[in-house]
A protein has these predicted regions:
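Residue-level detector of short, conserved catalytic/binding motifs and their immediate flanks
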Residues: 89, 125, 253
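Metal-dependent nuclease catalytic cores that hydrolyze phosphodiester bonds in DNA/RNA
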Residues: 1-97, 102-111, 118, 150, ...
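Metal-dependent nuclease catalytic regions and adjoining charged, substrate-binding loops involved
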Residues: 114, 133-221, 225-230, 234-266
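Metal-dependent nuclease catalytic cores in nucleic-acid-processing enzymes
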Residues: 66-72, 115-144
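A structural signal for well-ordered alpha-helical scaffolds and beta->alpha junctions
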Residues: 61, 65, 120, 124, ...
Length: 266
């Protein structure tokens, strides 16, 4: 038997996928657009091909969702419209909106769900506001849940989510206001009044060590600041003079519209 990776066919297939992905572009403004209206603005004004990484994530997530819903005996929610905003809840468990999310990282620790699942919960809040439901289900599949030092395993988590009436009313107002802002921005070709996306969608700020910490006294270089601090805290290194590490700050762009949008990062 002989097996070889065929780079030329691979490249052709990837280009075909990218060229044909999204040809059936969805019309109108969707609820998910109002979670990140500035990104939606740039997608309309300056459409770019989806990366193969984006396509791979989207297709794997949607395939899991479809299979799981079918196995549970539930149908995919139909596309509806409310005040000119289109939306599609993943499904309804009984009459309760339910959203299925797949993660390539661990589940949230207990007590940190609101922080870790913030973006998921904002989407659910929008659905609940429109459907006038104070209850929701958030179903999360972690593909890489830590089990021990040698392996990870997929793990499901089902969360009861509840909102109060004030939260629903505030979200209905926000959806309408954001829709109007987005429509005005597209009409005037100016996104300045649109809120920025969450920073984790824009870029990562990396602190890169360019010069390692160095002990002048004993002419020794250390890989980390921790190592240098450990040295001067020891009997052999007590009183030694340390030249601290030097760093540069690098921005690693995540969003393809980063240069157009120019987000402000801390």
């Amino acid at each position: 038997m002989k097996i070889e990776r065929n780079k030329s066919v691979e490249q052709w297939a990837i280009e075909e996928i990218q060229n044909n992905w999204g040809n059936e572009a969805r019309e109108g403004i969707h609820l998910t657009d109002l979670l990140t209206p500035r990104r939606k603005y740039w997608q309309v004004v300056k459409p770019l091909k989806a990366s193969i990484k984006e396509i791979s994530y989207w297709t794997s997530g949607s395939a899991i969702e479809a299979k799981i819903l079918a196995a549970m005996g539930y149908a995919k929610g139909e596309t509806k419209e409310w005040k000119g905003i289109k939306y599609s809840v993943d499904t309804f468990l009984g009459n309760i909106p339910a959203e299925i999310k797949t993660r390539r990282r661990a589940l949230a620790e207990e007590g940190k769900e609101e922080e870790i699942y913030e973006h998921y919960l904002k989407q659910l809040l929008g659905y609940c506001a429109i459907e006038n439901s104070t209850k929701a289900w958030l179903i999360v599949l972690s593909m890489l849940e830590y089990k021990d030092a040698t392996h990870t395993e997929p793990e499901w988590a089902f969360y009861d989510v509840s909102f109060d009436e004030n939260e629903l009313e505030d979200e209905r107002k926000r959806l309408i206001e954001t829709k109007l802002l987005l429509e005005d921005a597209l009409k005037n070709k100016n996104p300045d009044l649109l809120p920025y996306c969450p920073k984790w969608m824009c870029a990562r700020t990396l602190k890169i060590m360019t010069k390692k910490p160095y002990c002048i006294t004993c002419n020794k270089e250390f890989e980390t600041e921790w190592g240098a601090n450990k040295h001067i805290s020891s009997k052999t290194g007590a009183g030694h003079e340390i030249m601290p590490a030097e760093y540069e700050i690098k921005v690693e762009k995540i969003c393809k519209y980063y240069d157009d949008c120019k987000p402000v990062l801390d």
